[in-house]
Amino acid sequence: MTSEWWRTAAIYQIYPRSFADANGDGMGDLAGIRSRLPELADLGVDAIWLSPFYTSPQKDAGYDVADYCDVDPLFGTLADFDDMLAEAHRLGLKVIVDLVPNHSSDRHPWFQEALAAAPGSPERARYIFRDGKGEHGELPPNNWESVFGGSMWTRTTNPDGTPGQWYLHIFDSSQPDFDWEQEEVREEFRRILRFWLDRGVDGFRVDVAHGLIKADGLPDYTPPADAGSMGGNQHGLEGGVPLEPEIHDENVGAPYWGQEGVHEVYRDWRKVLDEYDGERILAAEAWVDPLARVAKWVRPDEMHQAFNFAYLETPWEAAPLRSVIDHSIETFAAVGAPSTWVLSNHDVIRHASRLALTADSLQGHGIGPKSPGLPDPVVGLRRARAATALMLALPGSAYIYQGEELGLPEAVDLPDEARQDPTWFRTDGERYGRDGCRVPLPWESDAPSYGFGPTDTTWLPQPAQWAEFARDRQRGVAGSTLELYRSLLAERRARSLATGDLEWIEGFGDDVLAVRNGSVLVVANTGSDPVELPAGDVILASAVLDGRTLPGDTTAWLAA
């Protein structure tokens, strides 16, 4: 890899509570992660990204942080983190950790101090407290609706028992938003960055990187019907044409997403990271439209990468895929950044299910047994394998979410009483939420909890079908999804595809993408009808080929 390793890296997302459990309490932990790192090095990824493991009440699976500079006992200790980090570096893996700057837990010492302090105090200034509307302040300060459902405001109770001010929380009421106009907040996060950089981490994935700053005056806002809960356009495409609205000053979207002032924060953070050697990076989770706006987060003096959610949200159709690939590369190149590519993460339906849905499912809503348009699992896995084979042939950096290398589908049939996503509770079960993509991984088909841990205890129940997806059933088995991923990553590296240039090849029909990247010709058939492959030795394919015929929902790499 080049010194700018992040430009080409294949980065594997670990959701710690669901990856591997070393102590048998049903919750994944840092010792479990450390024990399985050789499997990831063998898979062929370049780096790992860890979702939050910080001290937390776990009201939102760790994205409600009570102490940014310590490890929650659920996951271990700082010593366990240091051991895991050292082992990753020994294996040649970079380590990126999640950082959650938009909000803290309501159990964070600062917020507890704010609740105990008077309105207008320095303690309350760290968060966004406001008096309510109405004759007695009984109404929220504005009409904003939480990402998880319900009002974005919660009223406090004064020490004497009378109703008090309201505080803002874009997400759950247990996640109060910081006031990023306050220098004390900014200085605290510089300290947090340095704490982890000094320990040796290679970078940060920044949660809700398009949040933090709110519009002056906190004006009322009603999002359009097609808006995603996290800020981007919900579907991304219309009639096969990417929705790329022009950027105007008046077209800024929600007053709590993508405000211009957030870029000052990241320019400041970039200066902190540049004090350290080893190309430490910032990766933005920024759900904004269009891609030209996303590119603002990765200008040369800001962050290094931004997740390409436009690509993730693109359907398995040739024309929109080609459009978003071209537009992504062009848009990010204009600011000197690589495009990233991602198909799954801990907030969306796994792509082995999502790509076969026959009805829309809004981002963050999830699917369950009563959802319309539930996927055919055979079709879903076939499309997922083909989509991954296309993604890993593209230049730039690619993200892989734990379990997708096993072909895991969304766990649809979780019992209601087992669900833990705040979305499920705040919408009274109207939205299933994200639990289905967070179920603990299967490692060994015949072991307790399918090898996730030494006991049968798991924080979310594992479906019985997990046995057939277990890693030990796929390791070394030709044609398995695990071996497909290993081959794709090995060939991607050997043939320098991450630094290549694309040349589209015409003449294969409306449902087929054919693109040359260096020494590889990639042919992806998104339709149902088979097509004849051009000349060239087949390097690999996402499904079994019939001679020189490429079946539907299949991608092949050929020697160009």
Description of each model-found segment:
Residues M1-G536, L545-A560:
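Active-site and adjacent substrate-binding regions of carbohydrate-active enzymes
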Residues A541:
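A short, gly/pro- and small-residue-rich
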